[in-house]
Amino acid sequence: MPLFIPEDYTAKLAPETMEQAITYLKEIFPDMLARRLRLRRVTAPLFVLSGTGINDDLNGVERAVSFPIRDLGDRRAEVVHSLAKWKRMKLGTYKIAPGYGLYTDMNAIRADEELDNIHSLYVDQWDWER
């Protein structure tokens, strides 16, 4: 579905009020999520080294945004677009017991995302795994 904004659309909140609401939710949501689902917070990577298999390509056709890292001999890194594999690795690394899990605030870029009213190239989402 392409981006669609009705001609008679009016925002319910002023832009600064919307930003305050987003900030409020980003402050209270993780605590509630962690308590209810027995999760601990972990910091997500913004990028991972190419070729490690950590950057989950979702359906097999996504092209990762990548760049060379000079101090690693120009090895390439990829901006994450999914943390599915990374989260499962962290569950094992931290030896998180069954019934418990982890969550993160993932920031990603999905260059091949089909853009519409709810999908963007930039992704800012809560992500969790148990």
Stretches found by the model and what they are:
Residues 2-119, 129:
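Class II aminoacyl-tRNA synthetase-like tRNA-binding/catalytic domains
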Residues 121-125:
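Short, solvent-exposed loop/turn segments at the edges of secondary structure
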